[in-house]
C-alpha cells in the first residue's frame, strides 16, 4: 500500500537517542512490518521542519528532488514528438510548467556517515498548493488538471484533501517583488489614512450628513473631556437604536484613543473626513494589535511633534505587518531559496520538466527561449545531475540497464535491489553496494518495506539511491572523505553534470553551462528542419500514406522522405530538399487561386479539398507552439493563433536573399502544372487510340 491514512512518525524497529541517531540490526520478522520512514510536511509542521532542514541541507553531500504535478500536456499535439526541434521541445516544456500545478515536492538530502560507512538520507514529502494568501493578490491562481495524471495520482492513493486544505502555499521571487510594490501603493507612504483619500469627501446623502454631525458632536465631547478633565467616559453608548456600533476609550502607545467597533468602511471614510476638517489633533488609524487583529481607532496627539511621531510609528508598524504577511506568503519557496543558497549538487531523474516547474513556480515567468532559461537557471542552481542521462551515457551503467528501462522504478530495482527489498544480492555487479540508511526526527532505520512509488518524497529517495550506487560504480571511494568535500566538482562526474534531456520523453541533451544542444536520437539528427512542411486541416479521411502518394505524384516518387502525423488534423512532410518545400507551397497557393479544371484534376486536389487546408514551413510550427493557447486539435490551434499559409520563408529566417528564387519557384509551379496537363493529354490520347 502506498500510503497509510495515518503516517508513522517512528518505526517500532528503529532505536533512537536524544543526541545522535544509532543504527541497530533488527530481526527479519520485525523489519518485514516496518513502513518506510518518510517525513510528511504540511502547513502545520512546515516552520519546524524548515528549521531542521536547513542544517540537513547544509551538511548534505547532495540533495535529490522529485515533483508530482497535475498534468504534463495541455493538448495531445503538445506531447514530445519525433520531429520536434530543441527550441520547440523547450516551448512544450514551458507550456507544461506554466499550465499545471505542483502538488507534491520531494526533497531528500544525502550525507556520508564515515562512522557507519553509509549514506544517511532524510526524505521529506512536502504537500504544496498555490493558495491565495494575500488579500491584495491578483485573481486566484488557475491551473489545469490532466485526467490521466489525476487518475494516476489517485491510483497511488494521493491525498487530495491534504494537498488542498493543508498544502503549503508559496510566492515566486517575482510575485514577492510585485507584492511589495502593491503593498507600498496600497498603504501609501504615511501608512495612516486607511481610506487612501487625499481630497475632502463630499457628503451628498442625508444619512452621511447626519452621521457626520453626530460623530463631530461625540468626538468633540470626548476631546473636551480629555482636555478639561470632564466626563471622558471609557465607553460611549450605542450610536443608535439597533446598532452594534460602539466607541470605547483605550490607549494606543501611551496615548488616549477611541476604539471604533461596528463601523462600515464608508462610515469610517466619513468619520475620517470629519477629523481632517474639524480636529487637527485627532488622527484616524487602522492598525493591528499584538494578535494581528485589525482595529480602527482615533488617537489624540498633544502637539505637532507628537502627531509626527505617531505617523512615523504607524508607518513603521504597517511596514512590519506587510513584511510579516509577505514572508508568511512566501511559504514553500523558502525551501527552494535554501537549496539555491547552499549551492549543493541537485540530483533528479529525467528532471528538465521538474527544473522548469521550479523556475516557473518559485523564481518567475519562464524565459521565452531555451538559451535564456539555461543562463538564468544556472545562476540559481549551478550543479544539477540527471540520473537518467547518467544511466544512458555511461557505458557500464548503460549495459546494466539494457535489461530494463531507465524509468525511475526500473532503475531503482536494477541498481538498488538490496535497498528496495532489504536483501542481499548475488549479482556480482552489486557486490560492492552502497549502504543507505534513512533518518527522520533523529530516528535512523536501515530496514523497511518498500515505500510508495510516485510519492514525491519516496521518489526523491529512490533518485538519490540510484545516484549513490552509480557513483560507486564510477569509482568513487566514499571512505576518502576528500572526494566528497566538493562532490559537484569531482572529475568523475564532470561529463554528466548540468546535462539534461530537453523533454520528458525523448530529444536533445542540453548543456546548462553553455546552452548548446546535441541530438541524442539518430532519427532527429538525420533530417533538416528547413526540409519540413507543416500541413493542417486537410480532409480527415486522408492519412499519412495517402498524403505522401498525392505529393509524390506531383513532385516525383523520391520527393518525400516521410510523413509524420502531429495529430489527426495535421502532418509533417519531410521533403528531400528545401527547394521542394517552397515549390510545394507555391504550387498549393497557385492551385487554390485557380478556378480552372486543373485545381480539380491535380494530384494535390485531394489534400486541398474543402478549401481550408493550411501549409507552412517549420517556423510556423514553432510560432504555434509558442502560443499560450492550447486547443485540442492542432488545426484549431493554428486557426486560433492566426498562422496563415506561407509560400516563402520569413525574412528573419533567411540566410540569403531569395528575391530571384521566389520568381523561380513561381515559374516552377507553373511548369509543374503545365507538365501535369501535358502528361494528362498524352495519357488520354493514348487511351482513345
Swiss-Prot record:
UniProt EC number: 3.1.13.4
Subcellular location as annotated: Nucleus; Cytoplasm
Cleaved signal peptide residues: none
InterPro entries in the cross-refs: CAF1_poly(A)_ribonucleases, RNase_CAF1, RNaseH-like_sf, RNaseH_sf
GO cellular component labels: mitochondrion; nucleus
Protein origin, superkingdom: Eukaryota
Highest classification ranks of the organism: Eukaryota, Viridiplantae, Streptophyta, Embryophyta, Tracheophyta
Protein name, entry field: Poly(A)-specific ribonuclease PARN
Binding site for a divalent metal cation: 66, 68, 354, 459
Record bears the keyword Hydrolase: yes
Required cofactor(s): a divalent metal cation
Amino acid at each position: 500500500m502506498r500510503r497509510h491514512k495515518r503516517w508513522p512518525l517512528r518505526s517500532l524497529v528503529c532505536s533512537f537517542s536524544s543526541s545522535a541517531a544509532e543504527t541497530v540490526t533488527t530481526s527479519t520478522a520485525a523489519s518485514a512490518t516496518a513502513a518506510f520512514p518518510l517525513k510528511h510536511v504540511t502547513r502545520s509542521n512546515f516552520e519546524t521542519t524548515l528549521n531542521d532542514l536547513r542544517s540537513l541541507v547544509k551538511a548534505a553531500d547532495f540533495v535529490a528532488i522529485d515533483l508530482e504535478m497535475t498534468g504534463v500536456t495541455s493538448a495531445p499535439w503538445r506531447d514530445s514528438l519525433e520531429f520536434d526541434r530543441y527550441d520547440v521541445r523547450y516551448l512544450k516544456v514551458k507550456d507544461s510548467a506554466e499550465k499545471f500545478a505542483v502538488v507534491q515536492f520531494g526533497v531528500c538530502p544525502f550525507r556520508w556517515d564515515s562512522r557507519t560507512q553509509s549514506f544517511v538520507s532524510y526524505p521529506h514529502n512536502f504537500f504544496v498548493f498555490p493558495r491565495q494568501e494575500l488579500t491584495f493578490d491578483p485573481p486566484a491562481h488557475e491551473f489545469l488538471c490532466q485526467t490521466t495524471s489525476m487518475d494516476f495520482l489517485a491510483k497511488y492513493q494521493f491525498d487530495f484533501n491534504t494537498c488542498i486544505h493543508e498544502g503549503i502555499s508559496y510566492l515566486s521571487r517575482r510575485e514577492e517583488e510585485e507584492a511589495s510594490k502593491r503593498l507600498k501603493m496600497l498603504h501609501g507612504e504615511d501608512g495612516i489614512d486607511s481610506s487612501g483619500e487625499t481630497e475632502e469627501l463630499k457628503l451628498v446623502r442625508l444619512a452621511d450628513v447626519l452621521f457626520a454631525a453626530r460623530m463631530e458632536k461625540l468626538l468633540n465631547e470626548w476631546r473636551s473631556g480629555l482636555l478639561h478633565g470632564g466626563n471622558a467616559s471609557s465607553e460611549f453608548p450605542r450610536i443608535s437604536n439597533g446598532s452594534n456600533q460602539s466607541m470605547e476609550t483605550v490607549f494606543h502607545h501611551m496615548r488616549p484613543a477611541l476604539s471604533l467597533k461596528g463601523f462600515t468602511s464608508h462610515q469610517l471614510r466619513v468619520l475620517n473626513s470629519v477629523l481632517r476638517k474639524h480636529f487637527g489633533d485627532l488622527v484616524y488609524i487602522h492598525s493591528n494589535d499584538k494578535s494581528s487583529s485589525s482595529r480602527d481607532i482615533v488617537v489624540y496627539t498633544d502637539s505637532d511633534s507628537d502627531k509626527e511621531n505617531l505617523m512615523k510609528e504607524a508607518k513603521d508598524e504597517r511596514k512590519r505587518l506587510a513584511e510579516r504577511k509577505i514572508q508568511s506568503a512566501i511559504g514553500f519557496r523558502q525551501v527552494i531559496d535554501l537549496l539555491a543558497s547552499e549551492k549543493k549538487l541537485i540530483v533528479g531523474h529525467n528532471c528538465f520538466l521538474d527544473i522548469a516547474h521550479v523556475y516557473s513556480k518559485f523564481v518567475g515567468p519562464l524565459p521565452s527561449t531555451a538559451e535564456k532559461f539555461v543562463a538564468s537557471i544556472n545562476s540559481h542552481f549551478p550543479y544539477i545531475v540527471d540520473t537518467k542521462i547518467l544511466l544512458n551515457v555511461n557505458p557500464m551503467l548503460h549495459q546494466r540497464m539494457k535489461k530494463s528501462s531507465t524509468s525511475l522504478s526500473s532503475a531503482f530495482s536494477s541498481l538498488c535491489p538490496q535497498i528496495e527489498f532489504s536483501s542481499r544480492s548475488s549479482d556480482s555487479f552489486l557486490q560492492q553496494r552502497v549502504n543507505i540508511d534513512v533518518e527522520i526526527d533523529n530516528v535512523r532505520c536501515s530496514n523497511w518495506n518498500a515505500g510508495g512509488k510516485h510519492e514525491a518524497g519516496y521518489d526523491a529517495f529512490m533518485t538519490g539511491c540510484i545516484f549513490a550506487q552509480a557513483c560507486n560504480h564510477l569509482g568513487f571511494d566514499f571512505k576518502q572523505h576528500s572526494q566528497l568535500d566538493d562532490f559537484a566538482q569531482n572529475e568523475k562526474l564532470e561529463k554528466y553534470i548540468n546535462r539534461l534531456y530537453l523533454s520528458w520523453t525523448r530529444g536533445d541533451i542540453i548543456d546548462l553551462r553553455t546552452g548548446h544542444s546535441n541530438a541524442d536520437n539518430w532519427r532527429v539528427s538525420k533530417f533538416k528542419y528547413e526540409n519540413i512542411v507543416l500541413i493542417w486541416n486537410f480532409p480527415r479521411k486522408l492519412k499519412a500514406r495517402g498524403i505522401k502518394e498525392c505529393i509524390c505524384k506531383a513532385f516525383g516518387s523520391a520527393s518525400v522522405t516521410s510523413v509524420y502525423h502531429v495529430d489527426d488534423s495535421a502532418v509533417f512532410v519531410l521533403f528531400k530538399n528545401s527547394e521542394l518545400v517552397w515549390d510545394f507551397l507555391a504550387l498549393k497557393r497557385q492551385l487554390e487561386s485557380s478556378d480552372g479544371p486543373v485545381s480539380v484534376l491535380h494530384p494535390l486536389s485531394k489534400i486541398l479539398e474543402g478549401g481550408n487546408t493550411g501549409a507552412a514551413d517549420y517556423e510556423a510550427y514553432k510560432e504555434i507552439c509558442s502560443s499560450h493557447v492550447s486547443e485540442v486539435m492542432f488545426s484549431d490551434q493554428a486557426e486560433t493563433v492566426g498562422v496563415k499559409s506561407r509560400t516563402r520563408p520569413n525574412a528573419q529566417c533567411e540566410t540569403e536573399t531569395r528575391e530571384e528564387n521566389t520568381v523561380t519557384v513561381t515559374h516552377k509551379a507553373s511548369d509543374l502544372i503545365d507538365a501535369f496537363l501535358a502528361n494528362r493529354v498524352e495519357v488520354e490520347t493514348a487511351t482513345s487510340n
